[in-house]
Amino acid sequence: ELSYFSTYIPIKATDFDKVELYRLKEQAQKVINEHILSTHIAVMFFSDLLKYKVEFSDDDFETLKAFLKIEFKRMLRKVGYKNFQDIDFKSVDELLVALLDVCEEMHYEASDYCDRIGFQNEGISPYMGSLCSYLHFLHPLLTKFSQLHSIPSYLYILIDDADNLNTTQKQVLNSWVYYRLGTNISLKISTQMRYNVYLTLSGQTIDSPHDYSEVNISNVYTSSKNKYKELIHDIVQRRLVEFKLPNTNPNDFFPEYKKQEEAINKIYKYYIKQFEEGKSRGSKKFDDANRYSRPDYIKELKSSSKQGSSYFYSGFNQLIHLSSGIVRYFLESSTYMYSEMLKNSTKKEIEFISPTVQNKVSRAYSNEFLFEEFEKHKKTAKLRGYSSDNIRYLRNLIDALGGLFSAILLSNASERRVFSVAISNEPDELITEVFELGVGLGYFQISTIGNKEGTGRTRLYVMNRRLAPVFTLDPTSFAGYKFLRNEELKLAILDPQNFIRSMKKKLSLNVEEDLYVNDQLELFEE
């Protein structure tokens, strides 16, 4: 039994960003935006109580009836709502529906007002509806429910994709965080890295850890060898069971390409034998086998095929790595795979996703990330406040680093599985901006490592492994990282092909130069 009750608020599934509100004065925008957010969350909360059929005790029912007759009516008078009528409720559900209806009516008062003023060319009629706030409406309302015995005392408001809120709405949300009223009511806010507003409505800043605790989910998952893998395994297994599919083992449902794995295993055994004969680079029996068997296989494919496209991205474990610590990536690509199998199958039930389909969809999903989604970023750059030049530089940077990582994979370096770069000297403003844009758009993840001199720490930028198929890289680990100078990265964003040629030349002279291994960065190593 859970110790909390949560309500999920997906911002992407709302129409909060009312452009008509920009016609109002700044203070009016703030007040109406807070009202829209507050009433929407209240509506979702009561909808969830009804949806999940929460059973309330008789004592709680009496408590709620008394609350509606006195406290709730007083709250409604304060926010300007005058249509509430006393009703002799026969059941808790009837009472919850009444609460839901009131909150929904107040929400649409403001929403409809925004739509109407969009048609007013001259002068704007004043808003005459109710105005709810977090402090005087939403928080006391939720607090009352947290005091009941029939539901857990901790209520979590899960606000997803908060980066999609407009600037004023982010300030509203920041103000709620700033109040720090989280004894029983806790705000859990998820956002992409592009959430860039940390001011409240009154101009105060919110700071971590003073006002909130911040967790980078990608860092949590990608820094653990088992946590993310176990999470995906549990999610997939539950879904396979729920849909009553004949095969509920994720490893069997997403099988490896047998011919490929047999060839890699043959190379793996070769390196084990080399160790036993005292001819290995690594100090442990499985070091070389883990490091080189898959890169060597890809290298062999590259030598026999110009594109190297016969490498298969298949198998449950490899698909987990391709998702780069982001659950949505795994589930979305899996959905495409299942649809592809249904389209080409004569059977009523899908027993497994064939390696061919896994590989086909994985490559298409990777291409979509780099090509189609990048085109969207180009078209919306101005609207979202991005520099169009920086969008172009970011694309060049990805191409340049993808080419560099591919060259390292095909080299004789001691560590060929490289997905990360660190900057060995001080990056200039442009390089910093381009990397930050890449992090914000999900093409890079950010971490830290010890600097080259061993005197402190520096930022490490990890390329999203969803891009691995574009460059035919091994996604199953990223133990190595490459130090690059600011001047080299400047060449990468301006002329990626010249950068790749320059890096290949350096690799041919000294393959180990500025190439390092960090065991803490290994992901799901077997």
Specify the residue positions occupied by each region the protein language model found.
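Alpha-helical repeat scaffolds in large eukaryotic proteins
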Residues: F46, H139, T143, Y178, ...
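C-terminal leucine-rich, beta-strand-based interaction scaffolds used for sensing/assembly
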Residues: I11-K12, S213, Y270-E526
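The catalytic "switch" region of P-loop NTPases
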Residues: R116-G123, S130-L158, L165-K306, I353-N390
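A short acidic (Asp/Glu
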Residues: K18-Y22, N166-V172, V197-S202, E332-T335, ...
